């Protein structure tokens, strides 16, 4: 991973050490993204033909390529650490020692069990130590880890570990509330339920007052 940013390497190594990295096999050989898209296009063509879809129809003929491009460049782009967001961290010269919260971060992910949509919002908080992070970078970190096949529990913890690693503090909290289309659109077909996951570190875990302050922020939009 020598071609990656220092921040990307640190985050990846922290997740691996904790057993929280997305399950990925070591590639037999490195292939570029254009080759990857070409190969996926071929496999999607076979899948659609097995479904008896007519790929000569002008509405369907480009679908395999569209899906391949979507997978590699968009909804699974977070599998590629070369796309890890550029992180701006500055010295905490202001001596901020109270909770900083970013609420209602929109995220769209993909259930790794059925490859259908997870649609939700995240709330992220941290108590600065020596560094503070550009607020938009929190949104970008959430979106990076959402752009993978995911389970919500792991996604929540990945965001937590990434921010703890980059900020040099355990005092981070993450909550995600999401609708899973593997529940909504198939199986039980429950269109109204949502899933909430929370991951707490440092004072958010050990201090009841800090934890309650965060949970009040999570509920603020209700």
Swiss-Prot record:
UniProt keywords, alphabetically: GTP-binding, Hydrolase, Metal-binding, Nucleotide-binding, One-carbon metabolism, Zinc
Entries under Gene3D superfamilies matching the protein: 1.10.286.10, 3.30.1130.10
Gene name tied to this protein: folE
Positions contributing to Zn(2+) binding: 111, 114, 182
UniProt pathway: Cofactor biosynthesis; 7,8-dihydroneopterin triphosphate biosynthesis; 7,8-dihydroneopterin triphosphate from GTP: step 1/1
Gene Ontology CC terms, in alphabetical order: cytoplasm
Domain of life, source organism: Bacteria
Enzyme class (EC, first level): hydrolase
Signal peptide: none
Catalytic activity as recorded in UniProt: GTP + H2O = 7,8-dihydroneopterin 3'-triphosphate + formate + H(+)
One of the protein's GO biological processes: one-carbon metabolic process
GO molecular function annotations of the record: GTP binding; GTP cyclohydrolase I activity; zinc ion binding
The protein's Enzyme Commission number: 3.5.4.16
Stated family: Belongs to the GTP cyclohydrolase I family.
Entries under Pfam families matching the protein: GTP_cyclohydroI (PF01227)
Oligomer status and interactors: Toroid-shaped homodecamer, composed of two pentamers of five dimers.
InterPro entries reported in the protein's UniProt record: GTP-CH-I_C/QueF, GTP-CH-I_N, GTP_CycHdrlase_I, GTP_CycHdrlase_I_CS, GTP_CycHdrlase_I_dom
Organism of derivation: Klebsiella pneumoniae subsp. pneumoniae (strain ATCC 700721 / MGH 78578)
Xref: PROSITE patterns: GTP_CYCLOHYDROL_1_1 (PS00859), GTP_CYCLOHYDROL_1_2 (PS00860)
Name of the molecule in the record: GTP cyclohydrolase 1
């Amino acid at each position: 991973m020598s071609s990656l940013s220092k921040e990307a390497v640190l985050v990846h190594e922290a997740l691996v050490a904790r057993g929280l990295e997305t399950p990925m096999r070591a590639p037999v050989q490195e292939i570029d993204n254009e080759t990857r898209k070409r190969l996926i296009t071929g496999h999607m063509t076979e899948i659609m033909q097995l479904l008896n879809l007519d790929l000569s129809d002008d509405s369907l003929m480009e679908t395999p390529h569209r899906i391949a491009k979507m997978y590699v460049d968009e909804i699974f782009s977070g599998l590629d650490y070369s796309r890890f967001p550029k992180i701006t961290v500055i010295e905490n010269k202001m001596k901020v020692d109270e909770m900083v919260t970013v609420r209602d971060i929109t995220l769209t992910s993909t259930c790794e069990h059925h490859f259908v949509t997870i649609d939700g919002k995240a709330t992220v908080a941290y108590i600065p130590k020596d560094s503070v992070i550009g607020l938009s970078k929190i949104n970008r970190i959430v979106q990076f880890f959402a752009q993978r096949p995911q389970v919500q529990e792991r996604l929540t913890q990945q965001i937590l570990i990434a921010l703890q690693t980059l900020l040099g503090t355990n005092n981070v909290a993450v909550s995600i509330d999401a609708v899973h289309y593997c529940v909504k659109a198939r199986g039980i077909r429950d269109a109204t339920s949502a899933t909430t996951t929370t991951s707490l570190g440092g004072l958010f875990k050990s201090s009841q007052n800090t934890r309650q302050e965060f949970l009040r922020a999570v509920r603020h939009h209700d």
